[in-house]
Swiss-Prot record:
PANTHER family: NADH DEHYDROGENASE [UBIQUINONE] 1 ALPHA SUBCOMPLEX SUBUNIT 13 (PTHR12966:SF0), NADH DEHYDROGENASE UBIQUINONE 1 ALPHA SUBCOMPLEX SUBUNIT 13 (PTHR12966). The lineage of its organism: Eukaryota, Metazoa, Chordata, Craniata, Vertebrata. Keywords: Acetylation, Apoptosis, Electron transport, Membrane, Mitochondrion, Mitochondrion inner membrane, Nucleus, Respiratory chain, Transmembrane, Transmembrane helix, Transport. This is NADH dehydrogenase [ubiquinone] 1 alpha subcomplex subunit 13. InterPro entries: GRIM-19. Signal peptide: none annotated. Complex I is composed of 45 different subunits. Interacts with CARD15, but not with CARD4. Interacts with STAT3, but not with STAT1, STAT2 and STAT5A. Interacts with OLFM4. It comes from Mus musculus. The keyword Transmembrane applies.
Length: 144
């Protein structure tokens, strides 16, 4: 038996047509220059907004400071009234405690001067509860 002849595939007559091998990607978005320009514009806008906000913050800070300065004499007067009230109550308590001690002068200054010496918190709240002293030292606290 004779072997059959193998027929090899050949190109068509005249050859194959040209093959398009270049990438054909659609154009997407902005060009690099326009994206750079948009970025610079956003940066400039952000700096401008930040500058405006800093001016507003500075104006609000000055307003707060002026309000605090205006109210400072009132707060100082309230603090002085509270201090004098506590000292008066301490003098009354001292008179009760030291009534049996001879030659004891109630309210005599331990400093031998006529100048006003602001009392320390320990002196003011020495005859009061620990809770009142800790509130005076650290402010009012809700936690234990």
């Amino acid at each position: 038996m004779a072997a059959s002849k193998v027929k090899q595939d050949m190109p068509p007559p005249g050859g194959y047509g040209p093959i398009d091998y270049k990438r054909n990607l659609p154009r997407r978005g902005l060009s690099g220059y326009s994206m750079f320009a948009v970025g610079i514009g956003a940066l400039i806008f952000g700096y401008w907004r930040m500058m405006r906000w800093n001016q507003e913050r500075r104006r609000l800070l000055i307003e707060d400071l002026e309000a605090r300065i205006a109210l400072m004499p009132l707060f100082q007067a309230e603090k002085d009234r509270r201090t004098l009230q506590i000292l008066r109550e301490n003098l009354e308590e001292e008179a009760i405690i030291m009534k049996d001690v001879p030659n004891w002068k109630v309210g005599e200054s331990v400093f031998h001067t006529t100048r006003w010496v602001p009392p320390l918190i320990g002196e003011m709240y020495g005859l009061r509860t620990k809770e009142e002293m800790s509130n005076a030292n650290f402010g009012f606290t809700w936690y234990t």
